Amino acid sequence: DAGYDMLNCDNGTYDAWYWAHPPGYMPENCNLEDVEHIKKFVDIPVVCAGRMTPQEGASAVKENKIDAVGFARQFLTDPAWVTKLMEDREEDIKPCICCHNACFNMAHYEGVPNIQDMDDTSNMSRCALNPMTMQSKKYKIVPARVSKSVAVIGGGIGGMETALVAAARGHAVTLYEKTDRLGGIFIEAAAPSFKEKDRNLIEWYRRAINNSSVTVKLNSEIKR
């Protein structure tokens, strides 16, 4: 009666803002049950958002529990994720870990540092895992003028990202890790049961390294 065409629903409020964009410690599909209930009382399309998984979302739409699913942060991490899903390449999707470290760049609070003060990031949402998000014209991986032999010391997330970018530019890269596996301190950080996306990210990087030209040396501590 009010003239709304659609309801895009979540449980977020000014006092519980995180329900609108659940962080990593909240369950996946945590808004779905309540949004399904809303659909029973309206005759316009109802959309559910908030850490929705494609599988659960598709099932809910198929069963007419909701009309559509809302996704946002995953597009910032991997803009091609829907294409990869359609091509049955889900393992190639770089996962959003729901960290809020860059996508909430636009959420400014007095007294809190924020890169909105920088001209090239003002009014732009970013991604901690994808520096090219909203900055594709500024950050590009271009072939190196001279191919070099590059040693990357440390096989954590930062080391693996560095190795992948250097290899993509045409350098011969060797990645040295003193332990028997890649992941670094992020392995411990991803240990809590609710951090499944963090563990998925480690596996994504390991797979990306394995599929690249990077040479990996495990159990290889580099000393001065």
Predicted features along the sequence, with ranges:
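Phosphate-coordination loops involved in phosphoryl transfer and adenosine-cofactor binding
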Residues: 146-150, 219, 224
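Short hydrophobic/charged patches on amphipathic alpha-helices used for structural packing
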Residues: 57-58, 206, 224
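Short gly/ser/thr-rich secondary-structure transition/capping motifs
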Residues: 132-137, 214-220
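Flavin-dependent oxidoreductase catalytic cores
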Residues: 1-153, 157-173, 181
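Beta1-alpha1 glycine-rich phosphate/pyrophosphate-binding loop at the start
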Residues: 1, 152-219
